[in-house]
Regions:
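Short, acidic/hydrophobic/Gly-rich beta-strand patch recurrent on exposed beta strands
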Residues: 35-40, 202
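Divalent metal-dependent catalytic cores for phosphoryl transfer on phosphate-bearing substrates
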Residues: 151-152, 161, 172-293
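OB-fold single-stranded nucleic acid-binding module
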Residues: 23-32, 45, 52-98
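Structural detector for short beta-strands of small beta-barrel domains
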Residues: 11-28
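Divalent metal-coordination and catalytic microenvironments
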Residues: 17, 63, 166, 275
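Acidic/His-rich, divalent-metal-binding segments that scaffold phosphate/diphosphate chemistry
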Residues: 92-214, 238
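OB-fold nucleic-acid-binding modules
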Residues: 1-13
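N-terminal intrinsically disordered, cationic/polar leader segments
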Residues: 272, 290, 294-307, 312-315
Length: 315
């Protein structure tokens, strides 16, 4: 079985893979085909099943495990598989979808333990109570959901993994800049993307919910915090509550990026920069994992449509 990360350009492969997503499309000639994304625990790759028949459309659905044969190619410098032959995995074959999903490289319990250790460092009582309340409310989802649909940390457990990496960066930054309020940084980071559990449907065949499309996670987390403030009987007009809401509402940094306000305190600016840093690192790493040493990646649209080069010291 060929892992997706081990597929080489112009080489044939075969193996079992999960259909992460599938979309029925038509060619210019009006013929049906399936635009698919295949996945195993090492990564994802796209491919098209041409001249799709009704049986193909009925059988090859998201969440199904298939045996695939084909050729790994480049199209517009993007890796894809072509000349695909597919069949559904049989009962005695490795057909459990959970075996193929890309997951956080850190085990869930380790993520839980680390995040809980950071919660103990949130010294402001109001922020601490809000964080604990929402972590309890979305306990299961917070550690299972991805942080994004496609761009970064788009895998099972990606949300908590993203938060953990950001918290580790924040711990170092508050050492270098001791004037920063560490408690606000930690609370803001844990909460900033938590409403992704409301914005997305889950880690399998991830799609936007109606709330996600119409409202978005930035406004949704502000609503969650505001409701929590009322439930806990806190003063919604106190400075600490307003500052917590501010770092959450401003964490995308710019109005063009979806934040209704721009950062107006140091902690808000730092959370935005840490968020961007971790997301960008993940996008670069994901793209570089698809190419060999000495090659360049396909263009990464969220990173100003740039290519990145895989240097000799990278695995």
């Amino acid at each position: 079985m060929t892992l997706i990360k081990d597929m080489k350009v112009d080489q044939y492969f075969d193996g079992f893979y999960l259909i992460k997503s599938v979309e029925l499309r038509q060619t210019r000639a009006g013929k049906d085909y399936l635009a698919m994304i295949f996945q195993d625990h090492s990564g994802t790759i796209s491919g098209n099943l041409w001249d799709a028949q009704k049986s193909n459309i009925d059988n090859f659905q998201a969440g199904k495990v298939v045996h695939a044969e084909g050729k790994r190619e480049l199209y517009n410098n993007m890796p894809q598989v072509n000349q695909i032959k597919l069949r559904l995995a049989m009962p005695l074959e490795p057909s459990d979808p959970s075996e193929y999903r890309e997951k956080s490289p850190v085990k869930e319990q380790n993520l839980r333990d680390y995040i809980q250790s950071i919660v103990f460092k949130i010294e402001n009582a109001n922020w601490n109570r809000i964080v604990r309340h929402l972590l309890r409310k979305y306990d299961k989802e917070f550690y299972q959901f991805p942080a994004a649909k496609t761009n970064h940390h788009a895998f099972e457990g990606g949300l908590a993994y993203h938060e953990t990496t950001m918290l580790k960066l924040a711990e170092k930054i508050v050492e270098v800049y001791p004037e920063l309020n560490a408690s606000l940084m930690f609370a803001g980071i844990i909460l900033h993307d938590m409403a992704k559990v409301l914005e997305f449907t889950g880690f399998e065949d991830t799609a936007y919910t109606l709330k996600g499309n119409l409202i978005g996670h930035i406004v949704l987390i502000d609503e969650e915090v505001s409701k929590t403030v009322i439930e806990l009987g806190l003063d919604e007009n106190s400075e600490d509550i307003l500052l917590l809401r501010h770092v959450l509402l401003s964490h995308h940094g710019k109005l063009d990026y979806g934040s209704p306000v721009r950062p107006q305190i140091k902690e808000a600016e730092m959370i935005h920069l840490i968020d961007m840093m971790d997301a960008n690192m993940m996008m670069m790493s994901t793209a570089l994992n698809t190419v060999q040493t000495g090659q360049q990646t396909a263009r990464i649209w969220p990173l100003d449509n740039r290519n990145f080069y895989k240097a000799s010291w990278e695995k």
